[in-house]
Regions:
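N-terminal leader/targeting and pre-domain segments
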Residues: 1-21, 111-112
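Structural motif corresponding to alpha-helix initiation and N-cap regions
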Residues: 4-8, 58-62, 96
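Local sequence-structure signature of Cys/Sec-based thiol-disulfide redox active-site neighborhoods
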Residues: 11-49
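Structured beta-strand/turn binding interfaces of compact recognition modules in eukaryotic regulators
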Residues: 23-25, 56-58, 80
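Mobile acidic interaction elements
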Residues: 37, 41-45, 59, 83-84, ...
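Thiol-based oxidoreductase modules, predominantly thioredoxin-like and allied folds used
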Residues: 44-63, 72
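Short Fe-S-cluster ligation motifs
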Residues: 63-74, 111-112
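Non-catalytic, surface beta->alpha helical segment in thiol-disulfide oxidoreductase systems
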Residues: 79-111
């Protein structure tokens, strides 16, 4: 799918207004897929505040975010407007301590130091 300007602007607005942002299926309280559930649980465990977008509510965002990041799957994590990765990368980074380190180096408050 080609990324139209309106969708690109909407994506950039969402990730620009939140230091940590997760594109997911469902929402943090009611994820609609296992990968989105794991991704939001990781962020909750880290104790970071994060924005989110339920891509199931908007086809243009669901397809557009894949074109924007050049990444084929959802969920997708952005930190300070930078694409970090999906569920598997988040799991690896959380287990190794890299995710907390990334939050700390970017000045994002966590409940884990």
């Amino acid at each position: 799918m080609e990324l139209d300007n309106t969708t690109k602007e909407n994506i950039e607005k969402m990730i620009g207004e939140n230091d940590v942002f997760l594109f997911m299926k469902g929402n943090p309280d009611f994820p609609m897929c296992g990968f989105s559930s794991v991704a939001s649980a990781i962020l909750k465990k880290c104790g970071v505040e994060f924005g989110h977008c339920n891509v199931l509510d908007d086809e243009s965002i669901r397809e557009g975010i894949k074109a924007y990041s050049n990444w084929p799957t959802i969920p997708q994590l952005y930190i300070k407007k930078e694409f970090v990765g999906g569920c598997d990368i988040m799991k690896e980074m959380a287990e190794s301590g890299e995710l907390i380190e990334l939050f700390n180096t970017r000045g994002i408050k966590t409940e884990i130091s």
